[in-house]
Protein backbone atom coordinates (compact mmCIF):
# COMPACT_ATOMS: atom_id res chain seq x y z
CA UNK A 1 0.00 0.00 0.00
CA UNK A 2 2.95 2.34 0.56
CA UNK A 3 3.92 2.06 -3.14
CA UNK A 4 0.53 3.42 -4.39
CA UNK A 5 0.74 6.81 -6.10
CA UNK A 6 -1.93 8.92 -7.77
CA UNK A 7 -0.75 10.13 -11.21
CA UNK A 8 -0.79 13.93 -11.59
CA UNK A 9 -0.87 14.60 -7.84
CA UNK A 10 2.61 16.11 -7.64
CA UNK A 11 2.11 18.91 -10.23
CA UNK A 12 -1.33 19.79 -8.81
CA UNK A 13 -0.02 19.90 -5.25
CA UNK A 14 2.99 21.95 -6.28
CA UNK A 15 0.91 24.46 -8.23
CA UNK A 16 -1.61 24.93 -5.40
CA UNK A 17 1.16 25.56 -2.86
CA UNK A 18 2.92 28.07 -5.10
CA UNK A 19 -0.25 29.94 -6.11
CA UNK A 20 -1.40 30.65 -2.55
CA UNK A 21 -4.94 31.64 -1.55
CA UNK A 22 -4.72 35.34 -2.56
CA UNK A 23 -2.47 35.50 -5.62
CA UNK A 24 -2.24 33.53 -8.81
CA UNK A 25 0.63 33.24 -11.28
CA UNK A 26 -1.01 35.43 -13.97
CA UNK A 27 0.57 38.82 -14.57
CA UNK A 28 -1.50 41.90 -15.19
CA UNK A 29 -0.58 44.97 -17.11
CA UNK A 30 -1.51 46.76 -20.31
CA UNK A 31 -1.71 43.62 -22.43
CA UNK A 32 -2.69 40.89 -19.97
CA UNK A 33 -5.88 41.09 -17.89
CA UNK A 34 -6.85 39.23 -14.72
CA UNK A 35 -9.47 36.45 -14.96
CA UNK A 36 -13.03 36.88 -13.70
CA UNK A 37 -13.20 37.18 -9.90
CA UNK A 38 -9.70 38.68 -9.65
CA UNK A 39 -8.40 42.26 -9.78
CA UNK A 40 -5.01 43.74 -10.57
CA UNK A 41 -2.80 44.34 -7.52
CA UNK A 42 0.46 45.80 -8.76
CA UNK A 43 2.18 43.16 -10.94
CA UNK A 44 -0.04 40.22 -10.03
CA UNK A 45 -3.75 39.40 -9.76
CA UNK A 46 -5.53 39.36 -6.39
CA UNK A 47 -8.86 37.80 -5.54
CA UNK A 48 -11.76 40.26 -5.11
CA UNK A 49 -13.00 40.23 -1.54
CA UNK A 50 -16.32 42.07 -1.93
CA UNK A 51 -18.82 40.51 0.41
CA UNK A 52 -21.91 42.46 -0.75
CA UNK A 53 -21.47 43.93 -4.24
CA UNK A 54 -23.67 46.64 -5.79
CA UNK A 55 -27.12 47.59 -4.46
CA UNK A 56 -27.09 44.77 -1.91
CA UNK A 57 -24.32 46.62 -0.06
CA UNK A 58 -26.52 49.75 0.29
CA UNK A 59 -29.43 47.67 1.61
CA UNK A 60 -27.21 45.90 4.16
CA UNK A 61 -25.74 49.21 5.39
CA UNK A 62 -29.20 50.81 5.79
CA UNK A 63 -30.51 47.71 7.58
CA UNK A 64 -27.60 47.68 10.03
CA UNK A 65 -27.99 51.41 10.75
CA UNK A 66 -31.73 51.03 11.46
CA UNK A 67 -31.07 47.99 13.65
CA UNK A 68 -28.47 49.87 15.68
CA UNK A 69 -30.85 52.85 16.12
CA UNK A 70 -33.53 50.48 17.47
CA UNK A 71 -31.04 48.96 19.91
CA UNK A 72 -29.96 52.40 21.14
CA UNK A 73 -33.60 53.46 21.59
CA UNK A 74 -34.33 50.33 23.62
CA UNK A 75 -31.37 50.94 25.90
CA UNK A 76 -32.31 54.60 26.32
CA UNK A 77 -35.87 53.63 27.24
CA UNK A 78 -34.58 51.17 29.85
CA UNK A 79 -32.19 53.68 31.42
CA UNK A 80 -34.76 56.48 31.27
CA UNK A 81 -37.06 54.41 33.51
CA UNK A 82 -34.18 54.15 35.98
CA UNK A 83 -33.78 57.94 35.97
CA UNK A 84 -37.44 58.52 36.89
CA UNK A 85 -37.38 56.25 39.94
CA UNK A 86 -36.35 57.87 43.25
CA UNK A 87 -34.59 54.74 44.63
CA UNK A 88 -31.18 54.38 42.96
CA UNK A 89 -30.10 51.46 45.21
CA UNK A 90 -32.81 49.00 44.14
CA UNK A 91 -32.14 46.85 41.05
CA UNK A 92 -34.54 47.47 38.18
CA UNK A 93 -35.71 44.89 35.68
CA UNK A 94 -36.47 46.58 32.37
CA UNK A 95 -38.89 43.85 31.37
CA UNK A 96 -40.82 43.76 34.65
CA UNK A 97 -44.32 45.26 35.01
CA UNK A 98 -44.59 48.73 36.43
CA UNK A 99 -46.72 49.24 39.53
CA UNK A 100 -49.50 51.75 38.82
CA UNK A 101 -50.79 54.03 41.59
CA UNK A 102 -54.25 53.45 42.99
CA UNK A 103 -57.04 55.65 41.61
CA UNK A 104 -59.03 55.87 44.85
CA UNK A 105 -57.53 58.25 47.43
CA UNK A 106 -56.90 56.65 50.86
CA UNK A 107 -59.35 59.04 52.58
CA UNK A 108 -62.32 57.49 50.77
CA UNK A 109 -61.23 53.92 51.43
CA UNK A 110 -61.33 54.17 55.23
CA UNK A 111 -64.79 53.79 56.74
CA UNK A 112 -65.55 54.09 60.42
CA UNK A 113 -67.53 51.15 61.79
CA UNK A 114 -69.31 53.17 64.50
CA UNK A 115 -71.19 55.48 62.10
CA UNK A 116 -74.47 54.28 60.53
CA UNK A 117 -74.47 53.77 56.77
CA UNK A 118 -75.87 56.56 54.58
CA UNK A 119 -79.47 56.34 53.37
CA UNK A 120 -80.17 54.39 50.20
CA UNK A 121 -81.20 57.50 48.28
CA UNK A 122 -77.73 59.00 48.79
CA UNK A 123 -75.82 55.87 47.78
CA UNK A 124 -77.39 55.39 44.33
CA UNK A 125 -76.31 57.92 41.75
CA UNK A 126 -79.37 59.37 40.07
CA UNK A 127 -79.22 61.05 36.67
CA UNK A 128 -80.57 64.55 36.44
CA UNK A 129 -83.60 64.28 34.14
CA UNK A 130 -84.91 67.80 34.43
CA UNK A 131 -88.68 68.31 34.69
CA UNK A 132 -90.87 65.21 35.02
CA UNK A 133 -92.87 64.48 31.82
CA UNK A 134 -96.61 65.14 32.11
CA UNK A 135 -97.78 63.00 29.15
CA UNK A 136 -97.41 59.22 28.96
CA UNK A 137 -94.97 57.95 26.36
CA UNK A 138 -96.31 56.84 22.97
CA UNK A 139 -97.05 53.13 22.51
CA UNK A 140 -94.26 50.95 21.17
CA UNK A 141 -95.38 48.75 18.31
CA UNK A 142 -93.94 47.36 15.10
CA UNK A 143 -97.16 48.33 13.32
CA UNK A 144 -98.26 51.70 14.75
CA UNK A 145 -101.16 52.11 12.26
CA UNK A 146 -103.04 49.17 13.85
CA UNK A 147 -102.95 50.65 17.36
CA UNK A 148 -106.46 51.72 18.41
CA UNK A 149 -105.93 52.45 22.08
CA UNK A 150 -106.49 49.93 24.88
CA UNK A 151 -107.05 46.49 23.38
CA UNK A 152 -108.20 43.70 25.61
CA UNK A 153 -108.49 40.02 24.86
CA UNK A 154 -107.05 38.07 21.98
CA UNK A 155 -106.72 39.86 18.65
CA UNK A 156 -106.87 36.88 16.28
CA UNK A 157 -109.32 36.51 13.37
CA UNK A 158 -109.39 32.71 13.82
CA UNK A 159 -111.46 33.03 17.02
Curated annotation (Swiss-Prot):
The way this protein sits in the membrane is described as: Single-pass type I membrane protein
The reply on keyword Transmembrane helix is: yes
This protein's record includes keyword Magnesium: no
Q: Where is the signal peptide?
A: 1-26
* Chain ranges on the Extracellular side, renumbered to this chain: 27-57
Stretches assigned to the Cytoplasmic side: 79-159
Q: Where is the region Disordered?
A: 122-159
Give the subcellular location: Membrane
* Organism domain of life: Eukaryota
State a GO cellular component annotated for this protein: nucleoplasm
Q: Where are the transmembrane segments?
A: 58-78
The protein's matches in Pfam families, at most eight in alphabetical order, are given as: WBP-1 (PF11669)
Keywords, A to Z?
Answer: Membrane, Signal, Transmembrane, Transmembrane helix
Q: What is this protein called?
A: Transmembrane protein 92
Amino acid sequence: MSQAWVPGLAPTLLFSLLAGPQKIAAKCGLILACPKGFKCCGDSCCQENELFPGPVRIFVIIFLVILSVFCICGLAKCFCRNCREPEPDSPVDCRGPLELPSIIPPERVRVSLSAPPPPYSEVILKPSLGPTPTEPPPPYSFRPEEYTGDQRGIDNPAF
